Amino acid sequence: MKFARIALLISGITGTLLAGLTSAHAASTDPITPGASDFAAMAQCKALQTKYPSLKGKDLVVGLGGYTKGFEAPSEKDPSIIEGLDPSLFERISSCLGAKHSYQTGSFNVLLTSISSGRADIGPMLYVTDERLKQIAFVASMQVQDGSILAKGNPKKISSVDDLCGKTVAAAAGSYEANKLVPEQSARCTAAGKPEVSMLMVQNTDNSIQAVKSGRADIYLTEAGSAIAIAKADKTLQSGFTVDLPIMVGFPIAKDNATLRSAVLDAMKVIQESGAQKKLLDYWGQGSAAERPVVERG
């Protein structure tokens, strides 16, 4: 799956359109049980509301750096509603803690700065990398596998990362792919006497998709579940190979916000114990096998 993520800005919908969107509590978009209201009534969650009184009734600001289909994206039925794995989990986390949440959008490459500076309280699931851990902490509960997006028919015959030599990869600025995966593969290519991997740096995933569609890029690497969903929604594209990554994915929270980190960790433990996260992973396309025991990093 991909987490550095990671962020698919739906074509034609800008981040500013939904800036400041109010809490997703207003309309749950998944049928999975236990639902948000169920967690609000659980004894374990009532205990957490007592343990973290400063969060009860608080509006938690969720920063978004674009949209990633399957993780967080405007609903096709009602674009004013953000749906996906992250909103489904945020609904349950905030309900368990007696809090509320709202969304604000911006550029992906400044998302962590927004969280560490306090402009946002928490972000969507992202790759947990050593570089990011220098700036931010995480509450992580998933393992990562990248998928790929190609033009229909795979005209460049790209079947694995080894086929990226001499090709152009679209990558979002600040993403794991841009900072690590592509540079490392390019180094392997040149060491083998092959052409380097070119990188087309863009500001969000929507631009990456458009780059593949227009031919400016040969491939886009993103979370595996998102890659499948993107290709399914756009008949000019197809999903390709996958890459296992030695990375977990988690919610970024400021290092100095120990209360929120501890509260989210505790709430996620309740959610995992209920079986809801595995069900949500299957429902939104990431696959329940990606779940790992929730941990705090950083």
Where does each model-flagged region fall?
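Ligand-binding clefts/hinges and TM-proximal coupling segments of bilobed small-molecule sensing domains
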Residues: P31-T50, Y176-M199, K235, S239, ...
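A ligand-binding cleft/hinge motif common to bilobed small-molecule-binding domains
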Residues: V110-T113, L126-Q135, V182-E184, A211-L245
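Extended ligand-binding regions for polar small-molecule ligands
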Residues: A27-A43, P87-C96, P155, D162-T168, ...
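Short helix-initiation/N-cap motifs at beta->coil->alpha
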Residues: L85, S102-T113, K156-K157, P195-Q210, ...
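Acidic, polar ligand-binding/catalytic clefts
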Residues: P87, K100-D163
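Extracytoplasmic small-molecule ligand-binding "clamshell" domains
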Residues: A27-L126
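Periplasmic-binding protein-like
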Residues: Q143-A151, I228-K269, Q286-G298
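Bilobed "Venus flytrap"/periplasmic-binding protein-like clamshell domains
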Residues: Y67-K69, P79-S95, Y127-V128, Q145-N204, ...
